[in-house]
Amino acid sequence: LCELNYTPEKKGRIDVSKAMNINEKFQLSRQFWSYQVENGVLTDPRAFINPVPHVSFAQGEDQINYLRKRYDKLAANHMFPNMQFAEDRETFAEKLPLMSQGRDFDAEPVAISWTNAGTDINYGSLTGQFLDAAKRNGTEIRYGREVTNIKREGNFWKVTVKNVHTGDKQVVRARFVFVGAGGYALDLLRKAGVPEVHGYAGFPISGMWLKTDNQELVQQHKAKVYGKAKVGAPPMSVPHLDLRVVDGKESLLFGPYGGWSPKFLKEGSYLDLFKSIRLDNIPSYLGVGATNLALVKYLVQEVFRDFDGKVDMLHEYYPAADGKDWEVVVAGQRVQVIKPAAFPRFGTLEFGTALVNDQNGTIAGVLGASPGASITPAAMIELLERCFGEHMIDWGDKLHEMFPTYGKSLKRDEAAYDEQWAWTQKTLGLDTDENTL
């Protein structure tokens, strides 16, 4: 709705196809959650999803012209209803009072486009509710376990699991394995000998944020606000100032700031990166390093950016920000996937979420980061189609029960889009006037 990376400008025209594709996939997530709410699996939707307006922010004439063209394109599309646009300082100050404080509107013009259809999602709470439901249905959940190896053994996969507390190991055999191990997914797929990931590499990037719980500030910023990347800057460099709701408590987060650690998981090993380097993926690493100097420069700058430097970045959004109100928090660890490419590039950065499976459909995994969790149900539908295609006809009724628009194009079917939107808004408790700009 507001991320400008998904609506690039090409030869003076705004391409909204990626934004439409991601929006369509996110609607499947909303349908899946709504189905689970109606069936008692998710018992408290407002614990994980809350209405929060989404805003796109432009600074300077070039960005304003881009944002105006983007707004015109999205406002005419049924998948982005009730989009609004303003470039006067009075509306800006009314909608974003915190960001207007200390701002010299005469020195640099600004503009915003916004929609009240946005949400804030706490995926930790969502995951917790799914696990609670699994336990209620008799599922035993074992924590402190790490999959250390996956090997083919006849018609089965032999999965080695280690108890991280005792060191004891257990072997589980399965006909199908799904690898949803975050930053460790690529390593496990490589250990399994999946040829589809030959030459793949991963580069870890940590995320840091400035956070404030000062309610005097929080109450003046009831939105997620995304800006535009500087010319030549990588997509992950785009900062945003967000209202977040966690366990019912509102906070503001600004970032992300890129950090660097060789770990592939937040609690991983400092040897993760070095152990992942193999003969087949060295060209991928070298190719990306040589052809993505902007990314290398960005990471170096971010690693050496101190607290005052982080606050200086915040000043672009909130000019009157005082560092005393903010603290640095370390978020998760993401592994940027590097895909092998032909000469002369050798390696390319993959910025989306990729589903990888072997040709027999017996093992699959998810690689990549953004948009990540928000489109997981759509990724799992794709997995079913790839790996269990012979069962899809038998499973059709159940899939349509869980995803009423499964098989339909929400990009083309406005009536279907509107119907599912009304249903999910009501079921998820989002049909409210609270938190609107």
Model-flagged regions — what are they?
Residues 217-291:
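An anion/pyrophosphate-binding glycine-rich loop and adjacent beta-alpha core
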